[in-house]
């Protein structure tokens, strides 16, 4: 029933506006307060629709934890240090970060932890797994403590709604979501359409104007990076971004995943995870305009290897039986193998220009 209610709400918006932006459609599907995907589902894990690196192996979070400690040390071990995670999922990554660094008492004492999470069900999970820690939860990224800060964004930006534009017949048009049979009030089938835009967006001026090519823009990426840039410029620190994406924005990358399988993004509203490949070039352009240092993209496998994942693998294997070792090997391969997440997922760092180079991302 909830699924059909969401379909009706989307349909009403389409009829009222004669088609809606793709970003509006995605936002309704994903974060509608009553019927959205993140509002009512627990999507992450083997029983969910997708799985993230922290759920695959504890090694991922442990190494990120050591990376954060290095940033803290590089800022002369401040007595107050803000650790922020955007879209913390089940809370596994933050739990592993805090567990693996618990012996560094001075670091733990300095921490002011903030989790940015829009999903009530995921907040509930996070509060259970992180019940022993003092943490502030926010639905929006704002009013962070004005102290040195590290921001972690693992598979966050791919979930932000996107807009699509196409250069057709020498003019820009926007991709919208419409009703398949607009003449029928009973139609609940959606389709993509095109709409003239009166004035091209500023971002479109940077594109190459290739005929019939789709370009993607994420308003949420721009908004997030502008806020983080202002914060890091004022307070020092760094941001670590890990996501699947590419260095440009040419072609449609919208995808829908349900039960670990790809599905039609215009079906199963509120039941499927809608994402897109992250445009790292857009992130870099936005951050460099704010006078921040942005690292080159590094494959996840290379990044984790530089932090010592193989050594950590060996240390953990010593206390495992054969069955657990086999699973451990499989997890390692999934994280770093070039045919799996090792190459598909990219890592980018952003830092204050007066902060030290970032471990695993910049040549010293």
PLM segments and residue spans:
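Short glycine-enriched loops at secondary-structure junctions
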Residues: 30-35, 197, 243-247
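A residue-level signal for conserved active-site and pocket-lining positions in enzyme catalytic cores
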Residues: 29, 151, 283
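Long, Lys/Arg- and hydrophobic-enriched amphipathic alpha-helices
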Residues: 200-364
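A mobile, often basic/glycine-rich helix-loop segment
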Residues: 150-206, 254-264
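Rossmann-like AdoMet
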Residues: 1-86, 90-140, 146-148, 311, ...
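A short SAM/SAH-binding and catalytic strip from SAM-dependent methyltransferases
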Residues: 139-141, 146-169, 215-223, 227, ...
């Amino acid at each position: 029933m909830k699924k059909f209610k969401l379909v009706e709400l989307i349909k009403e918006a389409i009829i009222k506006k004669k088609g809606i932006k793709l970003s509006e459609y995605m936002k309704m599907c994903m974060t509608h307060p009553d019927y959205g995907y993140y509002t009512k589902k627990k999507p992450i894990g083997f029983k969910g629709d997708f799985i993230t690196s922290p759920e695959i192996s504890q090694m991922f979070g442990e190494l990120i934890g050591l990376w954060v400690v290095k940033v803290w040390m590089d800022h002369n071990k401040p007595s107050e240090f803000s650790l922020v995670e955007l879209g913390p999922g089940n809370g596994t990554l933050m739990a592993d970060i805090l567990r693996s660094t618990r012996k560094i008492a001075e670091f733990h004492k300095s921490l002011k932890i903030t989790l940015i999470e829009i999903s009530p069900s995921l907040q509930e999970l996070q509060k259970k797994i992180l019940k022993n820690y003092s943490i502030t939860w926010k639905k929006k990224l704002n009013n962070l403590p004005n102290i040195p800060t590290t921001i972690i964004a693992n598979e966050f930006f791919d979930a932000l709604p996107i807009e699509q534009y196409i250069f057709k017949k020498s003019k820009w048009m926007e991709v919208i979501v419409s009703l398949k049979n607009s003449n029928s009030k009973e139609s609940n089938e959606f389709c993509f359409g095109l709409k003239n835009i009166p004035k091209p967006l500023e971002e479109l001026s940077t594109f190459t104007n290739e005929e019939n090519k789709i370009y993607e823009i994420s308003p949420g990426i721009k908004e997030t990076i502008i806020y983080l840039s202002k914060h890091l410029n004022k307070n020092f620190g760094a941001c670590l971004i890990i996501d699947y994406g590419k260095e440009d924005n040419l072609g449609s990358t919208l995808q829908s995943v349900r039960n670990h399988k790809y599905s039609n993004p215009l079906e199963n509203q509120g039941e499927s995870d809608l994402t897109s490949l992250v445009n790292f070039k857009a992130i870099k352009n936005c951050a460099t305009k704010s006078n921040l240092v942005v690292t080159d993209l590094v494959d996840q496998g290379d990044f984790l290897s530089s932090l010592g994942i193989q050594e950590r693998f060996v240390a953990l294997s010593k206390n495992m039986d054969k069955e657990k070792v086999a699973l451990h090997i499989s997890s390692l391969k999934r994280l770093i193998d070039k045919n799996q997440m090792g190459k598909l997922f990219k890592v980018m760092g952003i830092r204050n220009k007066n902060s030290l180079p970032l471990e695993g991302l910049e040549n010293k």
